[in-house]
Curated annotation (Swiss-Prot):
Keywords: ATP-binding, Glycerol metabolism, Kinase, Nucleotide-binding, Transferase. It comes from Schizosaccharomyces pombe (strain 972 / ATCC 24843). This is Dihydroxyacetone kinase 1. Substrate binds at residues 53-56, 104, 109. PROSITE patterns: DHAK, DHAL.
Length: 580
């Protein structure tokens, strides 16, 4: 995606920093130095400073605050800040106890942060520099003297170093603890596409990934990974490949940290910025499950979110931190997990993190009610005939799904067709099962239950209410007549429509499913003629193309979009199927 609301990189970076200060009044932005700092810092504690190119937010700036980073210096997007900027940041939060500078293992970062560090040392001040290197995708042979790249493990080093400094530990101890964390880190990423940097030309088409292609190990600045994969593997297969690179001790090129099943491990899942939280959350769970199943690793802490992004990158990363060993410093032992658990006041760090992931729900789960199975009809129907009629209807609906989806994408959110298809597939599965009965009331009520289980959103609720009302109408009618006929079904449909109207303001003329449903029901009640009722439903659906929508997301569509309502088309597909 090469479209942005703000295309000036300098405006982006500086205003992004100012936003953090807007939210946290203990933070101040140094505009000339382009860094943000915690102005209430304790001058007797070690100051912890980090930074790097912009575009990786919340790293580094959102982790500035009490108990974490003292300052973070920002370069332009994907470019290291200058040594002058960094040195100004160091002087801004100078401490009696000294300064620990943390950067990621990239040449530009090391040179600029290192130059600033040497200036501070020349001035007679205590200062140390550590570079986070946690990427496993580029092995020892390829990385050579440069070493591993720095990825999302950097955030855990920020947290641990900041917590150690907040305890008042000396610079040597804080540095030793932070280095111990780096030595136990492994990370890897996977991406579906390169990212576009605001203000830059789009990536050349010949360099862009194809639709059925992804890159394993792609860096956070669009750098190449270890390989491109086509076709894109299943998520389970992809996770297996990623964990193998992280944990396979037989791969001497990448076996940086030995992690075994009985180790204490922290898992950090990183969203590169462009994955929906729904998809990212599902991926995170799959990683946790794969660790347990394939490696017997059960993390003691799990973090998931956008920690070190690549602008709006379509990808994710996995970071594992081995925390089994206590770090020994001057006769004292320190737990990395305890330091991670230590409270902070930094905007980017998760506030809600339970200290014991092994805690389980002890009260048990309530069961989902199956419905009233004690209601019975005084009559039965030809089971196979009804079954086939329903099958015809649902298959016709499934066949119509692409058309429904097309029109709903033009005038809505595009999910009407797929939602109806899910419901149809659920009904088909039910009617072909042993649970399908010859009791007409139970058939209708069970279909209502199936709809509840398989169709979400507004349309699912509307159809479920309609069919529950249908079952009630059938029950009331059969209690009086004890005879099953087209009039019985018509009476049930009339009650179903009345029931639906209790819960929706939609009426004919509003460009909704009601424009097809109401004429169908009214015609069938009046004539008991199915074909005539279906024809009226078609006319009602066709008419919606010229209506102004008054309900649903279609309300926001421009008047020039003339398409029939997708919900009305769905009704037509259902009732039309009964005539086949």
């Amino acid at each position: 995606m090469d479209k942005h609301f703000i295309n000036d990189p300098e405006v982006l970076v500086l205003d992004g920093l100012k936003s953090l200060a807007d939210m946290n009044k203990t933070l101040t932005v140094h505009e000339e130095g382009k860094f943000i700092y915690f102005h209430d810092y304790n001058k007797k504690n070690v100051s912890v400073i980090s930074g790097g190119g912009a575009g990786h937010e919340p790293t580094h700036s959102s982790f500035v605050g009490k108990g974490m980073l003292t300052a973070a210096v920002s370069g332009s997007i994907f470019a290291s800040p200058s040594s002058k900027q960094i040195y100004t940041g160091i002087k801004q939060v100078e401490s009696e106890a000294g300064t620990l500078v943390i950067c990621k293992n990239y040449t530009g970062d090391i040179l600029h942060f290192g130059m600033a560090l040497e200036k501070q040392r020349t001035a007679g001040k205590k200062a140390e520099l550590i570079a986070v290197a946690d990427d496993v995708s580029v092995g020892r042979k390829k990385s050579g003297k440069v070493g591993r790249r720095g990825l999302s493990g950097t955030v855990l080093v920020h947290k641990i170093a900041g917590a150690a400094a907040a305890r008042g530990l000396p610079l040597e101890a804080v540095t030793t603890i932070a280095k111990a964390a780096i030595d136990n880190l492994v990370s890897i990423g996977a991406s579906l596409a390169h990212v576009h940097v605001p203000g830059h030309e789009p990536i050349a088409k010949e360099d862009e990934m194809k639709h059925d292609e992804m890159e394993l190990g792609m860096g956070i600045h669009n750098e190449p990974g270890c390989k491109r994969i086509s076709p894109i593997p299943s998520i389970d297969d992809l996770i297996a490949q990623m964990l193998k690179q992280m944990l396979d001790q037989s791969d001497k090129d990448r076996a940086y940290v030995k992690i075994e099943g009985d180790d204490e491990v922290v898992l950090l899942m990183n969203n590169l910025g462009g994955l929906s939280m729904l998809e990212f959350s599902a991926i995170s769970h799959k990683v946790k499950e794969a660790l347990a199943k394939e490696y017997k690793i059960n993390p003691v802490r799990i973090f998931a979110g956008p920690f070190t992004t690549s602008l709006n990158g379509l990808g994710f990363g996995i970071t594992l931190l081995r925390t089994t060993d206590r770090v020994k410093v001057e006769g004292e032992e320190y737990s990395l997990v305890d330091l991670i658990d230590q409270p902070v006041e930094a905007i980017g760090w998760p506030l809600c993190q339970p200290s014991d992931l092994k805690s389980k729900n002890k009260i048990g789960n309530v069961s989902i009610e199956e419905g009233q199975k004690d209601v019975k009809s005084p009559v039965t129907v030809d089971k196979e005939k009804v079954r086939q009629a329903i099958v015809n209807s649902m298959e016709n609906l499934i066949k119509a799904e692409p058309k429904i989806t097309k029109f709903d994408t033009m005038a809505g959110d595009g999910d009407c067709g797929t939602t109806l298809k899910r419901g149809a597939e659920g009904v088909l599965k039910f009617v072909k099962s042993d649970k399908f009965s010859d009791d007409p009331i139970r058939i209708v009520r069970d279909i209502a239950d199936v709809i509840e289980d398989n169709m979400d959103g507004t349309s699912g609720a509307l159809y479920a209410i309609f069919f529950h009302g249908f079952a009630k109408g059938m029950k009331d009618t059969l209690e009086k007549s004890k005879d099953i006929s087209s009039k019985t079904w018509a009476a049930g449909l009339k009650v179903a429509l009345d029931t639906l109207f209790k819960y929706t303001p939609a009426r004919p003329g509003d460009s909704t499913m009601c424009d097809a449903l109401v004429p169908f029901v009214e015609t069938f009640v009046k004539t008991n003629d199915l074909n005539a009722a279906v024809e009226e439903a078609r006319k009602g659906a066709d008419a919606t193309a010229d209506m102004q929508a008054k309900l649903g997301r279609a309300v926001y569509v421009g008047d020039d979009v003339k398409v029939p309502d997708a919900g009305a088309l769905g009704v037509v597909a259902i009732v039309e199927g009964f005539t086949k």
